[in-house]
A protein has these predicted regions:
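Rossmann-like adenosine-cofactor binding region
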Residues: 53, 65-69, 183, 187-284
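Glycine-rich Rossmann-fold phosphate-binding loop(s) that bind the pyrophosphate
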Residues: 164-165
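A short helix->loop->beta-strand "cap" motif at the edges of active sites that frequently abuts
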Residues: 75-79, 99-101, 180, 239-241, ...
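Rossmann-like dinucleotide-binding domain for NAD(H)/NADP(H)
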Residues: 240-338
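Phosphate-binding beta-alpha-beta segment of Rossmann-like dinucleotide-binding domains, i.e.
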Residues: 99-101, 107-158, 170-173, 192
């Protein structure tokens, strides 16, 4: 490989890379979206990189990096990719390693925002706020307490966290202030973290779900976690349980979730993520849009966002790209879990 091109290309989602240029003086920073004038494809990316070599890429969530795309990028001299976000399920890590490329992410942004959003969704479910929305009988039904018969006291509720990284721990901290009894399952967290956080660690998914009043998902999407919450897992939750997901949609088998909601086995669900976004042809989304799921709340993958977190993410991603260009050790290289 020859000398690394001192150019950074933002591959998707973003327009003018003004903040990135501030972070990387002396480095040419371009937006693929601005260059091609439409939502970029992998073919657009490869064509532009061949014409205008880039040493590092900043990738958001819309571009998928397959084995063939990564091999071609490696041959074109791309040293590495920084995923502007926490998850990296749109990058084939094995193929990236084979191509000699370093993949990084930005795990230390937006933690508070996602944790706050998860708590808001959790409270929406447990306080039955879907039933509090004005309907055709409003205001005649103003004092109809039957709509709130399922509301449970938060103090002592068993909150199950699937995944106990930065965000999971931030949710635990917030939930404890409400009096939740927090338990969690994450085989990748070092031993003893339960003592530090004054929570309960369990050793299996079954132990996590059995008897839980609420399940909140905070794990990465991988082949190990894809559809981890399926019909069998949902059946372990008690009939009054609620589910919140601010991680990745495909961790849940959405057809099984829809069936559990329609049968009444689950009391409520609030999701910031779906398996495919935008959710074209998604049965769960379609039923929600038709008003068939009053105990469901969907938000459009915005848990990560605040004005401050958006700036934080872009600056940190750009700084990591700069380290890749200069051949310095990156701060957040992604490793392949075995």
């Amino acid at each position: 490989m020859g000398q690394t091109a001192m150019r950074v290309l933002v591959t998707d989602f973003m327009g003018e890379p003004d903040l990135e240029r501030e972070v990387l003086p002396g480095v040419e920073v371009e937006s693929l979206l601005m260059l091609v004038g439409h939502a970029p494809t992998p073919a657009d990316l490869l064509r532009v990189v061949e014409e205008r070599p880039a040493g590092a890429l900043i990738a958001w969530h819309e571009m998928v990096f397959s084995a063939s795309t990564l091999a071609a990028l490696g041959r074109a001299g791309v040293r590495g990719i920084v995923r502007a976000g926490v998850g990296y399920d749109n990058v084939d890590l094995e193929a990236a390693r084979a191509a000699g490329m370093t993949i990084c992410n930005v795990p230390d942004y937006g933690t508070d925002e996602v944790a706050d959003h998860a708590m808001a969704l959790l409270l929406w479910c447990l306080r039955c706020l879907g039933g509090a929305s004005p309907g055709a009988a409003w205001p005649q039904s103003w004092r109809d307490a039957g709509r709130f018969a399922a509301v449970r006291r938060l103090q002592g509720c068993a909150l199950a966290l699937l995944g106990f990284g930065r965000i999971g721990q931030a949710v635990a901290h917030r939930a404890q202030a409400f009096g939740f009894d927090v338990r969690w399952y994450d085989p990748y967290v070092p031993r003893g973290q339960d003592k530090v956080t004054r929570t309960t660690r369990v050793e299996s998914l079954r132990d996590l779900l059995t008897g839980a009043d609420a399940l909140s998902i905070h794990c990465l999407l991988s082949e190990e976690t894809r559809h981890l919450i399926d019909a069998q897992a949902l059946a372990l939750l008690p009939p009054h349980a609620v589910l919140v997901n601010t991680a990745r949609g495909a961790v849940i088998d959405e057809s099984a979730l829809l069936a559990a909601l329609r049968s009444g086995h689950l009391a409520a669900a609030a999701l910031d993520v779906l398996s495919h976004e935008p959710p074209v042809g998604n049965a769960l989304y379609d039923a929600y849009s038709r008003g068939e799921l009053p105990s469901v709340l969907l938000t459009p993958h915005v848990a990560w966002y605040s004005q401050q977190s958006a700036v934080d993410l872009r600056r940190k991603a750009a700084a990591e790209a700069g380290r890749l260009l200069r051949g310095e050790p990156p701060w957040n290289p992604v490793t392949i879990r075995r």
